Amino acid sequence: MHIFRAAGRIKTMGLIHKTKFVPFIDVSTTTTPSWKQIKKSTTFSMAFNPQTKTFDFISSENPEEEIDSYQPALSQSLTMFDDEDDFKTIFDMVFNLPTGGDAHRNVLLCFYASSYTTEDTPAVTYYKAWKVDSVVKLGTLDSVNQSIDFDLALNEHETGAVTVANGVPTWVPGTWDDGEFTPDA
């Protein structure tokens, strides 16, 4: 762990562990979300997949690339524990092979390494989060390794925060500015 002084405050720096990036999937069949953590995955590999355009400006010797947008995806390899909600949800999709709108699931990506705690009484801690309309792209069910591999295509994402009570996140729309969170009115 490294210690440094910034603006009169002492801060510590350390590695951010895998438990600080937490995906949740909405397992509800209604409009009220029921967030369940994707717990038994052995992979959390987010690819940002920048979509670029190349411009061959007359003032430049060589063509130049610019990022037009991103097409992020989160790869998962879910170990098959039959009593886990994440397995039940994904296996239901494996069994039914949904397409179109039926392959979409709302996902929360919580970045627990980045938070803001209010000075209110009682204090409220907000964690950075994305709420995402995700397409679940099923890959491989491997019965030998007891896993289901799938990708979450992270389509429309909204930045905001979550609060957590008893391990259950609640989505809070709002904005982050210089490390502080302001909930929408």
Q: What positions do the PLM features span?
A:
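Disordered, low-complexity tails and leader-like regions
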Residues: 5-6, 156
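Short beta-strand and beta-hairpin "edge-sheet" elements
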Residues: 44-46, 110-160
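Solvent-exposed edge beta-strands and adjacent loop segments
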Residues: 6-81, 131-146
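Extracellular/virion structural assembly segments
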Residues: 61-129, 159-166
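Intrinsically disordered, low-complexity terminal/linker regions enriched in Pro/Ser/Gly
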Residues: 163-185
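Short secondary-structure transition/capping segments
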Residues: 14-18, 153-169
